[in-house]
């Protein structure tokens, strides 16, 4: 396949990034399997995922194990016995029982499509992914209430010194079962330019794993121009339509100008992988812009 055109180069770069991320997170998963292993865990709140050699996935806990046999108790209370040699891997997953089955937690719930929510991934958790096929990104939990994320553009045809990179720390100030509040910074440096831009923000998220609302106010700034007189409002929401699909909307509003950028789409959820497909448009017209993101969590 030729990689001479910008689109082909973008696809080639994206495929390379996918391969690197998959290999990296695969090694993390392997370490997790060796750590958790085939054993009974003391913490009864932990959910284990057992994947058998035939591809079957079971969610629950290993209740008993010996040299050849495993007794597994599912989240629904069903006890299943199988041979130890039939197990492909075991790992700890986050989520909960709902409607009689296990719903994995959304590993990307610290953001909507691009905008942050007031949630944080937690110590030892994080993600790596790609926005719009050309912006590799990462996010890592720091302690129980902080995280730092960042990334850079890898747009084909643009010199390395002209690419963008960004960093976005976030601190959660309020954390309860149904409401979270946070403050943060989004800082962007356009390559070798001496000027940088960004915004500071504060926001809240209210709801649970089934549905939630996120809202915030941001104050844009430039390193030379200072803070803008017009703040930005972000209003968004998430609704879980099934155990592995979530509807998301993210909308940026400029009150002083009466304009808004609206977006909506879906996120496909696995215990580690999320894939997003959405469209964005402006109230001033200009058609629709497709959004495609994916990330792999640990």
Q: Model-derived features: where do they sit?
A:
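Short, glycine/charged-rich beta-strand-loop motifs at protein surfaces that mediate ligand recognition
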Residues: 248-255, 263
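Bacterial N-terminal signal peptides
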Residues: 14-25
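Short, conserved beta-strand edge motifs with alternating hydrophobic and charged residues
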Residues: 213-218, 248-250
